[in-house]
Amino acid sequence: MKEQAEIGATDDGGLHRLALSDEDKEIRDWFADQMITAGLTVRVDEFGNMFGRRAGTDPDAKPVLVGSHLDSQPYGGIYDGALGVIAALELIRTLNDNEIETTHPIEIVNWTNEEGSRFQPAMQGSGVWAGAHDLEEEYAKTDVDGDVFEDELERIGYKGEEPCEPPEEYEAYLELHVEQGPYLEENEKDVGVVTGIVGFTWGAITFYGEADHSGPTPMHYRQDALVAAADVISQIRRIPSTLGERTVGTTGYIDAKPNSINIIPEEVTFTWGFRDPSDDVIEEARRRVLEEAEWAAEREGLEWEYEDRMRAPAVQFADGCVDAVQTAADDLGYDSMQIFSGAGHDATHMHSICDTGMVFAVSENGKSHNESEYTSWDDCYAAASTIANAAVDLAGGAK
């Protein structure tokens, strides 16, 4: 973990390793070397997803896939994603060290661009692999500088030859991830047994008003796009409390034009996002925010439009995988709790391919997506041990 954290390290102990950047190439090269050293058969698909395979005793048995991602948020933490990939690698090393054979092959994976920071959407590599996104459409995506995804993938040398699709049926997919929330720590638990992932909806609203001088223009003459935006943003904060304990709402982006201290804003675009374990609750939150936008536009005399940017239904993990993780935690003597993930992960897409499960490691103070993200080594070990035992159980090996 410390070694991988040096690649893209920030001055404040975090990680800046965006997808398809030079730092991403460096960590991919490092990970490929680690897999080869561990005796794995390595392959890279046409979207840059990296796989390493350890053979099982039954050549016809479906593989168990374990992994996460190595890209990071801008100035993010060293555990997000990387802990899951390193734990998968350590699983292989432990099996090798103890000469443990499994009936099913075990594969480990580093998914391309889980974070969605440089190229959107998030969970891009697993989404293409699982058939949720079109390959050519995702190849054409650009970042803020106009760099094209496919060009950047080729530039770093990770546009592989394998098709970006499952080459065979899979027995199961397991993913270890830091919780990125406070619930495990608040409840003094060692690990989290994840039962599913919240659904979410993201969108953007744009109000169109009229720019004017901020001094001579009377208040009743104004068509202020930012006033309407502020009204709706305040409702995005309030709506979740009326819907459920696990409902959350966020405005993470706002752009005002002409963005001058002396001009009434004529155009404002901002985003909204809601998450909840219930798809019905998510849709109700979306309906309410659009209703609030319509009212705000009428009050201020504005035109407005909205864009649905991304939706993902809530995911319920397979009982067999949840039970395997729960049994592993119990057998190891860890105090665990079953928990719904409040964030999206590659497991969201893998759910459509095969039985899927997740393990959460404790996040100190619930912090993530920033440089202060922290999980103790004891908590890393607990989560890694749990997913290792669960994977071996599903793969038909002795723990």
Predicted regions and their residues:
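Acidic/His- and Gly-rich active-site-bordering loop/insert found
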Residues: M1-G77, L95
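Zn-dependent metallopeptidase/amidohydrolase metal-coordination segment
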Residues: M1-T10, G67-S68, D335-T386, A391-L394
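Active-site-adjacent substrate-binding region
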Residues: E6, T10, G146-T195, I233-R238, ...
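A short beta-alpha structural unit
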Residues: A19-L20, T250-N259, T271-G273, P277, ...
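Flexible, glycine/charged-enriched surface loops at secondary-structure junctions
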Residues: R43-D45, E101-P105, E161-C164, P216, ...
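Alpha-helical metal-binding/catalytic segments enriched in His/Glu/Asp
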Residues: V66, Y75-E115, T201-F207, H213-I239, ...
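Midchain, well-structured core segments that form catalytic/ion-binding scaffolds
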Residues: N113-E114, Q120-D279
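His/Asp/Glu-rich mid-to-C-terminal helical/loop segments that flank catalytic regions of hydrolases
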Residues: H213, H220-T242, R288-E291, A361-K399
